[in-house]
């Protein structure tokens, strides 16, 4: 093969969302000749020397690229990741970590679709069956009925985690795969919620929803429904925090109506003082197993609070969440134990995907290499992951 071009090495690393330091660690590039691993990698990217094949193989694995990609003459154009619902057309924001994550998701989706087609799965009629000019209450009822969602059961959950598990089961029961992914396999590559909150990939055979698990757990249910509405509309794309885009407002309104019907917000008085609003919204959200941000957004949309009040509340709730997140991180660091590798992985990929991969392996329709690719683990970890899932019911 021809020589590897330095710009290809740099492109592959940057589109994988890795810094020089993280990439050097990922490919196990050790210090040598007075240079750190990161400095050696930087030299390779400047064309100081050709990387040995062994290093290229490690790069292919760490950067999630086929080996042949490192012999391209020039970096290819960015792949289609669907619509960017976070901003107006022409103002899309590029983030290498997010781009790498979506490329990984798309690759998994292709394998999932292949497994489903081998099993002769029927197309899902609801995907792309709705339009954004449908009245919000009508589509909300249609989606909730299709899910057979009972708000009483959702709210009877012990907390936000259990409520999300109930909703996730309902969504996956309709043929949609719900994944929790917020990095490229390591906390070093965490993608902030400010970059993306959720992703919907529309397909009538293998529709996918991805939720950024860096977000508050109380927000996961709303994000799942928001992305599900995108699937009903036949949309593929990235969702963020800003709801300034019309289609995002519509999906927010439908998701919000499913979880908290507008009639339930009538008890909130207009003109609440800030501290009163914080307490009332917090109590209301806790009782319904939803996020305070969602409730305050609905109050804004209904004209029950001003935009300035909503902005102040959003800032306050976000600061409290960041403080809570830091406390939880400190607890985990101090604790001796914690969730095992397989418990965490099971939770991220969901019971529906675990079940599909298990059946496909049993029927000989997929290799362990491809199964690992779909589940986001190495081939040798597939069987322990599936076995532990079967023993514990997949949750």
Give the residues covered by each predicted segment.
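Active-site hotspot residues in diverse enzymes, especially metal/ion-binding acidic/histidine motifs
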Residues: 1-395
């Amino acid at each position: 093969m021809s020589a590897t071009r330095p710009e290809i090495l740099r492109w592959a690393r940057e589109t994988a969302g890795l810094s020089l330091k993280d990439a050097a660690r990922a490919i196990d590039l050790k210090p040598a000749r007075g240079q750190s691993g990161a400095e050696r990698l930087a030299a390779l990217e400047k064309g100081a020397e050709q990387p040995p094949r062994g290093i290229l193989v490690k790069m292919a694995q760490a950067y999630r690229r086929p080996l042949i990609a490192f012999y391209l003459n020039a970096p290819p154009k960015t792949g289609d990741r669907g619509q960017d619902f976070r901003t107006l057309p022409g103002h899309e924001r590029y983030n290498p970590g997010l781009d790498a994550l979506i490329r990984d998701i798309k690759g998994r989706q292709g394998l999932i679709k292949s497994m489903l087609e081998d099993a002769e799965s029927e197309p899902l009629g609801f995907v792309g069956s709705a339009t954004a000019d449908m009245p919000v209450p009508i589509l909300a009822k249609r989606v909730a009925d299709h899910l057979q969602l009972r708000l009483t059961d959702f709210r009877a959950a012990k907390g936000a985690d259990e409520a999300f598990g109930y909703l996730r089961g309902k969504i996956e029961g309709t043929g949609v795969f719900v994944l929790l992914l917020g990095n490229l396999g390591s906390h070093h590559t965490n993608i902030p919620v400010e970059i993306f909150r959720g992703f919907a990939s529309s397909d009538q055979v293998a529709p996918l929803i991805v939720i950024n698990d860096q977000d508050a757990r109380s927000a996961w249910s709303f994000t799942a429904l928001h992305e599900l509405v995108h699937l009903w509309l036949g949309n593929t794309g990235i969702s963020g925090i800003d709801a300034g885009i019309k289609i995002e407002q519509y999906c927010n309104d439908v998701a919000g109506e499913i979880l908290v019907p507008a009639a339930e917000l009538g008890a909130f008085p207009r003109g609440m003082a800030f501290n009163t609003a914080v307490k009332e919204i917090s109590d209301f959200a806790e009782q319904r197993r939803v996020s305070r941000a969602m409730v305050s957004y609905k109050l804004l949309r209904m004209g029950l609070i001003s935009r300035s009040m909503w902005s102040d509340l959003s800032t306050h709730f976000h600061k409290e969440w960041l403080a809570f997140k830091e406390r939880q991180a400190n607890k985990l660091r101090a604790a001796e134990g914690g969730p095992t590798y397989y418990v965490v992985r099971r939770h991220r990929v969901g019971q529906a995907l675990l079940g599909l991969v298990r059946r496909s392996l049993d029927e000989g329709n997929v290799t362990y290499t491809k199964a690992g690719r779909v589940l986001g683990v190495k081939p040798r970890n597939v069987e322990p992951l599936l076995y532990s899932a079967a023993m514990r019911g997949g949750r």
